């Protein structure tokens, strides 16, 4: 492994300075009026560039990952990846060095090879130039999701981006073009697609339990009262009112800024860009009654302008005549709610406030649940009947991963998401979500703003696939053959075990501590000397792992 720690010390929770702050409305978006509807124009696909539907790359037996952004969400991702076989965490990056160093301790705890640490405004750029990284995992603040992902793709790295992965149409189209041009994955880290209820409901939908799904609802309703001051404050964001990045972004931007938690799972159930697509959008919001009061409370002065409404509602119609409603409210006090409702010709599903099902009696056949006379979906099923349905349609992906990650974030959905990402990369399969999902789920901010800024006018929804939305019939997860899956998992387990053995044998953490101690003492000469020893030991460790894995593979 080459040494980048010395020149590195780079990171992100901000990456401020030269990076322009994202806004809901992008200057490059072209649109015109047509009979009272705002028609958003779709840029032509560059010559020689092909779509990236079902994109698959050669299997990556050992996924070498770098994390950028270690404030709120990033540290949890590091913890999870430390527990996924066949992964090597190569680099940790945050604007603040101490945050990255703190995450390093999780690698020590698990006995893995120490990662190189990057910090500061531009460190992520140096990180992305490294030749020994397969995946850049972006969990920075919203303003820096796009620039880091763009840099990663331009430097030949797959990227996984926390939500929202793009803040406007310009960023959506840029990431699409980069993914299509480079043939690299651009994955949206939408964990709610891996929730137990949503995954089981998806399995039911795919088996026709609900009949034809005609309407769906999703939301992000979550009072952030206890979080506003915990969000990072970007030194270069001109945050004179000390609002921290997320409240400041809501103050300056309109639209559903966080649509993906609600939209992602229902879009999969409706086969969006896999046989259907969104065609028209209309958005409406309340005035920012709570938002203005919140700013006044924090600043002690009247808030004259607050762009985002307290509660935003977005309605979308599909090419096949379905309707989706998405809501956003991070202001008013109320219970957490993602809605997740499916209305079909044969049944109904809802997750909040309690998970329920209402189905015809036909749906219960073969589940082992007790039959009830004249069950006709006029009321919710009994708990016994519902549990029987959930058991029958318990998703195979949940069976494989969720119990291993129950305590690793949001009831296990985070671990399932990361495990599936690694699984698909290791087996050379299309990812569960592609760059078009990312664009479709993130573009509501700009499209909704266009609607609301023009008296809630109808807005056409771009076809991000540029003509290929009907090529694939139905949403599907990709799986390796049982034999290939077993071989990949055996290699991954062996690699992780070997990495731990070599890390201990080479005394890598003692060498890392010597670098850390010299740095804390301010002894640059001693730090450079210790760093040189650590670099050499890590190179030797990589060679030892490679030799051991070749030997193990040859035996088989």
PLM segments and residue spans:
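Sec-dependent signal peptide recognition
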Residues: 2-8
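C-terminal segment of classical bacterial N-terminal signal peptides
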Residues: 14-21
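N-terminal Rossmann-like dinucleotide-binding module
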Residues: 24-110, 518
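C-terminal helical cap and adjacent loop that interface with cofactors, partners, or active-site loops
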Residues: 24-39, 43-47, 75-76, 267, ...
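A structured beta-alpha segment of the ubiquitous adenosine-cofactor-binding alpha/beta core
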Residues: 117-133
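Beta-strand-loop-alpha-helix segment that lines the small-molecule cofactor/substrate pocket
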Residues: 135, 141-142, 146-194, 208
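Predominantly a Rossmann-like dinucleotide-binding segment in NAD(P)-dependent oxidoreductases
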Residues: 185-187, 192-306, 421, 455
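Glycine-rich phosphate/pyrophosphate-binding beta-alpha loops
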Residues: 326-337
């Amino acid at each position: 492994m080459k040494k980048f720690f010395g020149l590195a010390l780079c990171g992100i929770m901000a990456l401020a300075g030269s990076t322009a702050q994202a806004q809901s409305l992008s200057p490059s978006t072209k649109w015109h009026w047509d009979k009272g509807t705002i028609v958003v124009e779709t840029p032509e696909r560059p010559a020689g560039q092909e779509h990236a539907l079902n994109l698959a790359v050669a299997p990556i037996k050992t996924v070498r990952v770098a994390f950028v952004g270690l404030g709120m969400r990033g540290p949890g991702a590091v913890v999870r990846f430390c527990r996924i076989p066949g992964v090597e965490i190569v680099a940790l990056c945050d604007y603040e060095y101490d945050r990255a160093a703190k995450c390093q301790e999780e690698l020590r705890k698990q006995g893995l090879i120490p990662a190189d640490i990057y910090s500061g405004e531009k460190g992520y750029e140096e990180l992305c130039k490294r030749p020994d990284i397969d995946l850049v995992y972006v969990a920075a603040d919203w303003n820096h999701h796009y620039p880091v992902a763009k840099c990663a793709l331009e430097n030949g790295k797959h990227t996984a981006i926390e939500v929202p992965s793009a803040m406007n149409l310009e960023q959506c189209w840029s990431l699409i073009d980069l993914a299509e041009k480079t043939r690299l994955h651009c994955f949206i880290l939408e964990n709610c697609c891996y929730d137990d209820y949503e995954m089981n409901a998806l399995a039911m939908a795919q088996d026709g339990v609900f009949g034809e799904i005609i309407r769906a609802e999703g939301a992000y309703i979550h009072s952030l009262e206890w979080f506003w001051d915990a969000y990072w404050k970007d030194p270069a964001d001109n945050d004179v009112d000390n609002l921290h990045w997320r409240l400041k972004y809501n103050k300056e931007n309109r639209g559903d800024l966080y649509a993906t938690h609600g939209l992602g799972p229902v879009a999969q159930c409706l086969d969006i860009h896999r046989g259907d697509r969104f065609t028209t959008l209309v958005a409406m919001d309340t005035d920012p009654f709570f938002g203005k009061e919140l700013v006044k409370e924090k600043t002690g002065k009247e808030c004259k302008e607050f762009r985002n409404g307290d509660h935003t509602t977005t309605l979308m119609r599909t090419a096949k005549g379905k309707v989706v409603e998405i809501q956003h409210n991070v202001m008013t006090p109320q219970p957490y709610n993602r809605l997740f409702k499916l209305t079909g010709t044969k049944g109904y599903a809802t997750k909040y406030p309690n998970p329920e099902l209402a189905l015809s009696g036909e749906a219960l056949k073969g589940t082992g649940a007790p039959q009830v006379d004249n069950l006709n979906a006029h009321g919710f099923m009994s708990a016994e009947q519902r549990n029987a349905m959930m058991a029958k349609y318990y998703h195979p992906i949940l069976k494989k991963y969720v119990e291993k990650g129950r305590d690793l974030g949001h009831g296990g959905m985070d671990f399932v998401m990361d495990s599936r990402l690694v699984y698909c990369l290791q087996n050379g399969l299309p990812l569960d979500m592609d760059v078009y999902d990312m664009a479709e789920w993130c573009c509501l901010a700009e499209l909704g703003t266009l609607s609301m800024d023009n008296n809630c006018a109808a807005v056409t929804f771009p076809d991000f696939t540029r003509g290929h939305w009907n090529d694939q019939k139905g949403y599907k997860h990709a799986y390796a053959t049982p034999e290939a899956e077993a071989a990949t998992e055996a290699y991954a387990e062996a690699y992780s075990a070997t990495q731990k053995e070599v890390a201990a044998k080479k005394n890598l953490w003692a060498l890392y501590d010597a670098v850390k101690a010299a740095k804390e003492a301010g002894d640059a000469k001693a730090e450079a000397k210790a760093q040189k020893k650590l670099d050499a030991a890590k190179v030797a460790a990589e060679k030892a792992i490679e030799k051991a894995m070749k030997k193990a593979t040859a035996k088989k």
